[in-house]
Structures are given as structure tokens and as C-alpha cells.
Design a protein with these regions (language model features):
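Contiguous, glycine/small-aliphatic-enriched amphipathic segments in soluble metabolic enzymes
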Residues: 1-126, 165
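Small-molecule pocket liners
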Residues: 30, 139-140, 148-151
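Glycine-rich beta-alpha junction loops
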Residues: 34-37, 70, 146-148, 157-159
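Beta-strand-turn-beta hairpins that frame and shape the catalytic cleft
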Residues: 59-62, 145-150
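Hydrophobic residues at beta-strand termini and immediately following loops
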Residues: 66-68, 142, 153
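Short, well-ordered alpha-helical segments in soluble proteins
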Residues: 98, 120, 134-137, 157, ...
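Glycine/threonine-rich beta-strand-loop-alpha-helix active-site module
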Residues: 118-140
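Glycine-rich phosphate/diphosphate-binding loop of Rossmann-like nucleotide-binding domains
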Residues: 152-166
Length: 166
């Protein structure tokens, strides 16, 4: 099984998650949609070994990567609206690959909605964006653990807008 992992905000924790996950032998293949330079630089900062592959891998310290370049250089912990298109592009590419059957699902890394909006792109969140990319008119956000499933009545709305959307 191949899972698409969108690394999210390049200056955030998403690349770290991919690198730390890659340190383990695993059953699934995690295909990381990320700038390879971001992964290499972050692995150096974390003092963890990685080898990037552009194919399936399940070996420890190897990262299967679908390369997408950032627009501007990434500084860890420093948000940059100029990389907003990059953040959306990795989600677009992963979604496209899932729809083509190349991946079994998507695991999304954290993004900063405010930074995307600062770039001039109207963005409310992953749920709505994935719905748009897949031409899905109705969506629900679901939180699940063990035997508990919680579907949210609304997503990404200001509190004063909730009652008008239920």
C-alpha cells in the first residue's frame, strides 16, 4: 500500500514527520510530496540519516519522494507566503495521484491557512480544498479513534457563522 504524504508548510513540522517516520522499517510505502532539498536540509538539522528514492521503499532511513520544488528558500520555523502555491501544489499532485489509483490515501501534513491567505489565495482548509479538487459537493470532517467516530456539523467557520450553516 502506498500512502501519499503531503509535507505541508515547508518551514513547519511536516518534513520532520516524514524524516522521523522514515527511520523505521514499515509495511506501507509513504510517498512524500516535498522539495527534496527541504528534506535533506531538515534531516541534517535533526541529525538523522536519509536517502531519497523516487520509487517505493520500505527500508529504514529511506524516503520515497515525489519532488516538488519550493518557490523560495525555506528557513525552518519562518513562514513565507511566497511558498503558498507550493503548499497547494503538493496537495493537488497527491490528490491527482490518488484519483489515478497510484496511492491508496492521503496523509496531510500541517499547513498554515493564514499564510496561504496572506499570499492572496482564498483558502479555508484541507477539507474544502480536497472537496474542490475532487468535485465533491458535500463533505464531512470525521474524527475517529477506537470505537468513537465524530462527524463535525461545520468546518473552518467563525463561531458567529456556525448557526447559519447548520
Amino acid at each position: 500500500m502506498t500512502i501519499a504524504f503531503t509535507s505541508g508548510e515547508p518551514s513547519g513540522i511536516g518534513p520532520d514527520i516524514a524524516i522521523i517516520h522514515a527511520q523505521k522499517e514499515r509495511q506501507e510505502n509513504l510517498l512524500v510530496y516535498c522539495d527534496p532539498d527541504v528534506l535533506i536540509n531538515r534531516a541534517k538539522q535533526l541529525n538523522l540519516p536519509i536517502t531519497l528514492k523516487e520509487n517505493e521503499t520500505r527500508k529504514a532511513s529511506e524516503v520515497s519522494v515525489f519532488p516538488v520544488k519550493t518557490v523560495v528558500e525555506v528557513e525552518t520555523g519562518v513562514l513565507n507566503p511566497k511558498n503558498a502555491n507550493y503548499v497547494l501544489e503538493i496537495i493537488r499532485k497527491a490528490t491527482h495521484d490518488c484519483l489515478k489509483g497510484q496511492c491508496s490515501g492521503i496523509l496531510t501534513g500541517p499547513i498554515n491557512k493564514a499564510v496561504i491567505n496572506q499570499s492572496g489565495i482564498k483558502f479555508s482548509g484541507h477539507t474544502e480544498y480536497l472537496a474542490e479538487l475532487t468535485n465533491t459537493p458535500k463533505t464531512v470532517m470525521l474524527l475517529a479513534t477506537g470505537q468513537l467516530r465524530v462527524a463535525l456539523a461545520t468546518t473552518h467557520l467563525a463561531l458567529n457563522d456556525v448557526s447559519n450553516n447548520i
